[in-house]
């Protein structure tokens, strides 16, 4: 399985052939979709909306798991949406149409929607895919500063090192290396996983500098 396929197992788009996945000690297959959505939010790499809404309307969709059928949003729901927009620095664009935003802004709207869910776990599948480097750094900096558990698929090794506390390196569907960035990203691991020779050095602020030979 690929890294994305592994993530799909967590948010239940695919079912495991064997084994068990639990969230806070409870097997996922024993949880309803709504119960799962109250604890887990997902941002995938394909987020083209088929209809146009304002930024605020899209972020409010994050409150859906917490509302019963036809229940109207309460003051707390609007407060959580506003707080999420503040965190992604888009409050001033709350009334803008989603389609009018840049790619980086659209991803931040989807992050705000995820935050409005109040999840205990945030899953990110290549959240910076197709974004310019500035927007990549902006988005990952916001995520890094959140007080929340995050499991992300990132293919850019240097970005993964910069923003992660713990890394898993996968090859052919299996985790072959894991640990802190400094423990995980070594010439030996890069040779084993990617088949490349390299020299890895670290800056004082623990950023990886990878030189391919």
For the regions a language model picked out, list residue spans one by one.
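Conserved ABC transporter NBD signature motif
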Residues: 19-27, 36, 96
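Conserved ABC ATPase "signature" region
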Residues: 60, 75-93
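Conserved ABC ATPase signature
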Residues: 97-101, 105
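Catalytic Walker B motif of ABC-type/P-loop ATPase nucleotide-binding domains
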Residues: 122-126
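ABC ATPase nucleotide-binding domains
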Residues: 187, 192-213
């Amino acid at each position: 399985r690929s890294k994305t396929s592994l993530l799909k197992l967590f948010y239940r788009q695919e079912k495991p052939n064997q084994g068990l996945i639990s969230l806070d000690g409870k097997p996922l297959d024993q949880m309803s979709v709504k119960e799962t959505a109250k604890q887990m939010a997902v941002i995938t790499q394909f987020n083209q909306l088929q209809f146009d809404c304002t930024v605020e309307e899209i972020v409010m969709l994050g409150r859906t798991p917490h509302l019963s059928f036809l229940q109207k949003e309460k003051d707390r729901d609007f407060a959580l949406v506003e707080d999420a927009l503040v965190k992604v620095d888009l409050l001033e664009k709350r009334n803008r149409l989603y389609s009018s935003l840049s790619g980086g802004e659209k991803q931040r709207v989807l992050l705000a929607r995820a935050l409005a869910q109040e999840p205990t776990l945030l899953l990110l599948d290549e959240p910076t895919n197709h974004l310019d480097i500035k927007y990549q750094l902006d988005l990952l900096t916001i995520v890094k500063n959140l007080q929340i558990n995050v499991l992300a698929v990132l293919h850019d090794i240097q970005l993964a090192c910069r923003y992660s506390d713990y890394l898993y390196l996968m090859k052919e569907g299996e985790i072959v290396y894991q640990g802190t960035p400094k423990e995980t990203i070594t010439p030996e691991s890069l040779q084993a996983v990617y088949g490349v020779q390299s020299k890895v050095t670290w800056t004082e602020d623990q950023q990886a500098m990878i030189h391919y030979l």
